């Protein structure tokens, strides 16, 4: 059906039907647009107001008609309006000019900071890198955050799922990662806000400015580009904004040859938007009402996130699990692509342990001796088994008290509490709230520190000296300070 109709840039069609965000457009014979081409519709509505929108071709229906999904509201659109085939997919601006700016799905700035200072654009649809271009040797991506680097290390060019409810520190963790990749790896970040609250998008922008991740005085010194398609926008925008953000990240990786962090909040909303569009396009729904192309849609996005020989995109994706059902097709399909999971725990946050990353629930495919080495692996497993034993003993402690435990168990509890405290650390981006300077801890320092706790070398130091510090030398210095103050 499609082969007989070659694309013609600039060909004009007529809107024949509008059903919500889906439009049917009729073109002259032989001048049908290609699938995924952008159509531009401009005109005046019945009230005489100018309207303009972009739609993406999704289906060729026959009878010289195509079906397209609108990227903005279709209010005021009427049959008979003219639609122009742009001849290419949606393209967004890329490069340094995007840093510190907020874009919508079409790459238009929405932050009232004027036009973007670049003519370089890139289409949002492209193939994933070929296998010959990929860096296949697994490499750990050092974040400088102890609990992540030791217990659930990130893979360079991998995908990480970030799980956590409201108010447990997701945003602060994201900001710290953006800060650390800029300082330690010379890399940049792209944040894709997919179908989340507009208020959260604004809060994040303000927090980025406050913490210095976005430099409001000199945008060129900013470390992140933002691309938003919030939950009040049509499903077409929410379905494609993840690809817009990914395209910006790919330019930094492929052209600038940088290491890039891509944040997607929330990957579930991407699937949800695809499900809405699928139903509107008349496709038969599959399990739980999701689109029949669920695996293809998620795979097309995830496979473009990769580490090449030139640079890498490491993606951290917030995953909403509907009704906490991990077997739901949307999170289940996403899990198949993840290399690591970072689970934030409210109980840890309430204890004041920040980052509140759960050391027992967070996992990584990188935590194996062949990748991280024997010493790292043994240390991580010993830390986890000590914390697990402490967790098992907590009921006994709550009922009978510490005194009823055996000598060995008391020692385990003592070390586990020190480990738990040592897993916390002050963040650079939180300096303005805490008054504590942030710490970036090298992986070897992290391993060495935990080994000393496990070996009992630091049993004599007070528990409080392990709280919110960087490496083990700072623990010793803090212990001396506490001892001096208590005299």
Swiss-Prot record:
List UniProt keywords, sorted A-Z.
ATP synthesis, ATP-binding, CF(1), Hydrogen ion transport, Ion transport, Membrane, Nucleotide-binding, Thylakoid, Translocase, Transport
On whether Nucleotide-binding is a keyword of this UniProt record, the answer is yes
Catalytic activity from the UniProt record: ATP + H2O + 4 H(+)(in) = ADP + phosphate + 5 H(+)(out)
Which EC main class describes this enzyme? translocase
Pfam families reported for this sequence: ATP-synt_ab, ATP-synt_ab_N, ATP-synt_VA_C
- Compartments reported by the entry: Cellular thylakoid membrane
Q: Is Membrane set as a keyword in this record?
A: yes
- In short, the EC number is 7.1.2.2
InterPro entries from the UniProt entry: AAA+_ATPase, ATP-synt_VA_C, ATP_synth_F1_bsu, ATPase_a/bsu_AS, ATPase_alpha/beta_chains, ATPase_F1/V1/A1_a/bsu_N, ATPase_F1/V1/A1_a/bsu_N_sf, ATPase_F1/V1/A1_a/bsu_nucl-bd
Q: How does it sit in the membrane?
A: Peripheral membrane protein
> Which residues pair up as cystines?
none
Listed GO cellular component terms?
plasma membrane-derived thylakoid membrane; proton-transporting ATP synthase complex
The residues that hold ATP are 164-171
Which Gene Ontology MF annotations are present?
ATP binding; ATP hydrolysis activity; proton-transporting ATP synthase activity, rotational mechanism
| Range of residues in the leader sequence | none
Q: Say which family it is in.
A: Belongs to the ATPase alpha/beta chains family.
Quaternary structure per UniProt? F-type ATPases have 2 components, CF(1) - the catalytic core - and CF(0) - the membrane proton channel. CF(1) has five subunits: alpha(3), beta(3), gamma(1), delta(1), epsilon(1). CF(0) has four main subunits: a(1), b(1), b'(1) and c(9-12).
Relate the protein's function as given in its record: Produces ATP from ADP in the presence of a proton gradient across the membrane. The catalytic sites are hosted primarily by the beta subunits.
- This chain belongs to which protein, by name? ATP synthase subunit beta
Source organism per entry reads Synechococcus sp. (strain CC9311)
The encoding gene: atpD
């Amino acid at each position: 059906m499609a082969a007989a109709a070659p694309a013609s840039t600039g060909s004009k069609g007529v809107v024949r039907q509008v059903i919500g965000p889906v439009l049917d457009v009729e073109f002259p014979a032989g001048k049908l647009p290609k699938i995924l081409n952008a159509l531009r519709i401009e005109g005046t509505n019945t009230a005489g107001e100018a309207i303009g929108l972009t739609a993406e071709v999704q289906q060729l229906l026959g009878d010289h008609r195509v079906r397209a999904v609108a990227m903005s509201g279709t209010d005021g659109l009427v049959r008979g309006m003219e639609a122009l085939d742009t001849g290419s997919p949606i393209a967004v601006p890329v490069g340094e000019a995007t840093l510190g700016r907020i874009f919508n799905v079409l790459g238009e700035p929405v932050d009232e900071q004027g036009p973007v200072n670049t003519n370089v654009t890139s289409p949002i649809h492209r193939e994933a890198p070929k296998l010959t271009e990929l860096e296949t040797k697994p490499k750990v991506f050092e974040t400088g955050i102890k609990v992540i680097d030791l217990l659930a290390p990130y893979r360079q060019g991998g995908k990480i799922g970030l799980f956590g409810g409201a108010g447990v520190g997701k945003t602060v963790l994201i900001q710290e990662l953006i800060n650390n990749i800029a300082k330690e790896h010379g890399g940049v970040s792209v944040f894709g806000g997919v179908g989340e609250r507009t208020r959260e998008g604004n809060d994040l922008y303000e927090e980025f400015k406050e913490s210095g991740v976005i430099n409001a005085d000199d945008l060129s010194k900013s470390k992140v580009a933002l691309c938003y398609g919030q939950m009040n926008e049509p499903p077409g925008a929410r379905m494609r904004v993840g690809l817009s953000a990914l395209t910006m990240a790919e330019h930094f990786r492929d052209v600038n040859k940088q290491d890039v962090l891509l944040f997607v909040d929330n990957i579930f909303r991407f699937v949800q938007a695809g499900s809405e569009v699928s139903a509107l396009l008349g496709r038969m729904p599959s399990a739980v009402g999701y689109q029949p192309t669920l695996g293809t849609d998620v795979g097309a996005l995830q496979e473009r996130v990769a580490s090449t020989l030139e640079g890498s995109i490491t993606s951290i994706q917030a995953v909403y699990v509907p009704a906490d059902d991990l077997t739901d097709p949307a999170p289940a399909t996403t899990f198949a692509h993840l290399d690591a999971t970072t689970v934030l725990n409210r109980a840890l946050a309430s204890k004041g342990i920040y980052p509140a990353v759960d050391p027992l629930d967070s996992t990584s495919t990188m935590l194996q001796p062949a990748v991280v080495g024997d010493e790292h692996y043994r240390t991580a497993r010993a830390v986890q088994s000590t914390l697990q034993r402490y967790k098992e003993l907590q009921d006994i402690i709550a009922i009978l008290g510490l005194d009823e435990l055996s000598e060995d168990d008391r020692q385990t509890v003592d070390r586990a509490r020190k480990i738990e405290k040592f897993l916390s650390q002050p963040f650079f981006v939180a300096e303005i709230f805490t008054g504590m300077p942030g710490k970036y801890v090298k992986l070897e320092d992290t391993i060495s520190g935990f080994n000393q706790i496990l070996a009992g070398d630091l049993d004599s130091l007070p528990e409080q000296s392990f709280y919110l510090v960087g490496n083990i030398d700072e623990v010793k210095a803090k212990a001396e300070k506490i001892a001096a103050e208590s005299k």
